[in-house]
Amino acid sequence: MSLVYMNIMIAFLTSLLGLLMYRSHLMSSLLCLEGMMLSLFILSTIMILNIHFTLASMIPIILLVFAACEAAIGLSLLVMVSNTYGVDYVQNLNLLQC
């Protein structure tokens, strides 16, 4: 495994660890999700370029489309929660609260 692959995997694992550790605020969770998507995009692009698999060249672009949709929905949810409750705690998203 080359050093580039290891660095990208470490970036993905760091973002995953951040998502698991700092899940009290919605903004921290969204930033960690964006880091995970960015590292997945870079990893898939490099792997497709290295193995010369031209049929799968659309996969990174599709991944970017899903990342953009995820970011838009996450930011709209963040604005809605911040306007409603005044803070961006994830515990405010529980729909089972009375």
From Swiss-Prot:
- Reaction catalysed? a ubiquinone + NADH + 5 H(+)(in) = a ubiquinol + NAD(+) + 4 H(+)(out)
Question: Which Pfam families does this one have?
Answer: Oxidored_q2 (PF00420)
EC number annotated for this UniProt entry: 7.1.1.2
Instruction: Tell me a GO biological process for this protein.
Output: ATP synthesis coupled electron transport
- Locations listed in the record: Mitochondrion inner membrane
Q: Does the keyword Thylakoid apply?
A: no
First-tier enzyme category under EC: translocase
Which UniProt key words apply to this protein? Answer: Electron transport, Membrane, Mitochondrion, Mitochondrion inner membrane, NAD, Respiratory chain, Translocase, Transmembrane, Transmembrane helix, Transport, Ubiquinone
**Keyword Membrane in record:** yes
Q: Which domain of life does the protein's organism represent?
A: Eukaryota
Membrane topology qualifier? Multi-pass membrane protein
Its family remark reads: Belongs to the complex I subunit 4L family.
PANTHER family reported for this sequence: NADH-UBIQUINONE OXIDOREDUCTASE CHAIN 4L (PTHR11434:SF0), NADH-UBIQUINONE OXIDOREDUCTASE SUBUNIT ND4L (PTHR11434)
What name does the UniProt record give this protein?
NADH-ubiquinone oxidoreductase chain 4L
State the organism named in the record. Mogera wogura
